[in-house]
Amino acid sequence: MGNTNQFNAGSNTVADSNADFKFKFLSNSLQQVYTAEKQWAVVLPILRLAVGCEDLIATLNKFEKEGKAHIQRLEVIFKTLNIPLKEAQNKDIEVLIEECYDIIDVTPINSFIRDAGLIVGIQQIQQYQITEYTSLLAQALACDEHKAVNLLRVIVHNKHQEEEQLAMAGTSQMLDEILGD
């Protein structure tokens, strides 16, 4: 009978260790996503200035507003999980942002070529964010953190909507310019 208790005690230690690992991974991922969202919030106004298409400008304005709400939700998650709020370096988002800057550097001002290039660059950032948020959601589910799960579901849903809005932004205006109408 003593062996059974030792086995159970050992299982709890392994389970606790596994739970600690999952939570630490969730914490690190949360900091990465938070940093990426903060960096994206800084870049959006710059991209908006580089765009010529009114529909795309309006879409970026909406993304900026929604991004602030995402940051607030992430801050609630930090507080709920009792994780210190800090930004971590996120090289992945930096590379994607740099690609948008490169598009601005090599394309003519107020051209559909620049707008189309920026849409592609922004779509890459959107895909990255959706992937990261979905991973974070799965981690929160694995840690049984219900409030975080609910907030992350809202963000993932909004990110998918943003992706759809971006796909439609400026399409007719750019087509008119291409066709010379």
Predicted regions and their residues:
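Amphipathic alpha-helical hairpins
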Residues: M1-D181
